[in-house]
Design a protein with these regions (language model features):
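Surface-exposed acidic, glycine-flexible loop patches that form ligand/cofactor-binding
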Residues: 70-73, 154-158
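Polybasic, proline/glycine-rich intrinsically disordered low-complexity segments
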Residues: 90-156
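Flexible, charged surface loops at secondary-structure boundaries
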Residues: 31-36, 70-78, 101
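Short acidic DE-rich linear segments
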Residues: 156-177
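Compact, well-ordered interaction domains used in eukaryotic information-processing assemblies
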Residues: 43-90
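Generic recognition of cysteine residues
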Residues: 24, 42-43, 140-141, 157, ...
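N-terminal "first-domain core" detector
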Residues: 1-51, 60-62
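Generic detector of well-ordered alpha-helical segments enriched in charged/polar residues
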Residues: 52, 56-59, 63, 93, ...
Length: 177
């Protein structure tokens, strides 16, 4: 398939708020899906120590700066933070990727490429893998990651969500029997 279109957002300074790593690199891109955007924030800290100290701060910034401005639930659910960090140990990767607050997180043990085409290839293949995983696992796990949305303005949307959760629960129950 053809490479999907990526749009780059130039203003990433706000995403660096409270991050104590002067040299951290952040790239914020949006990828057009059917009728919405997937938001992807790529980041590389100076070293593993810096990643450990600062990753939560970046997650908070993304939540404040990116997610709070989005109106569509589907876009709010499709925010990814990709941490590029060579030599990072398993426990740190696990810790970050299991964190369900507000965005989905991926840790890649490699340098973040300066070349945009290479970066896009890595991101596309990674997101594609995740999509396959999600389709295979079929469980409804995204709701607890959405605690940060304090109120749904739209009752209809809440009903949709409830319906979705019920369907997931129903499927899970039927699989057991």
């Amino acid at each position: 398939g053809k490479m999907r279109d990526y749009n780059y957002i130039d203003d990433v300074e706000v995403l660096k708020d409270n991050i104590l790593d002067e040299d951290c690199k952040i790239i914020y891109m949006k990828q057009k899906a059917e009728d919405y955007f997937i938001h992807i924030i790529c980041c590389q800290f100076t070293d593993v120590e810096s990643l450990k100290m600062n990753w939560k701060e970046l997650v908070n910034n993304v939540s404040e700066v990116v997610q709070k401005r989005l109106n569509d639930l589907i876009e709010i659910y499709n925010v990814y933070i990709v941490f590029f960090q060579p030599q990072v140990e398993d426990s740190v990767v696990y810790n970050i990727e299991q964190n369900k607050y507000s965005s989905r997180k991926i840790v890649l043990r490699k340098e973040m490429p300066d070349d945009k085409t290479k970066l896009e290839q890595i991101i596309s293949s990674k997101l594609f893998d995740l999509k396959i995983e999600k389709e295979n696992s079929e469980q409804c796990c995204f709701t607890d990651s959405m605690d940060f949305i304090t109120s749904f303005n739209d009752e209809n949307c809440e009903k949709e969500l409830e319906k979705y959760i019920e369907e997931c629960a129903w499927e899970a129950m039927n699989e057991k029997n």
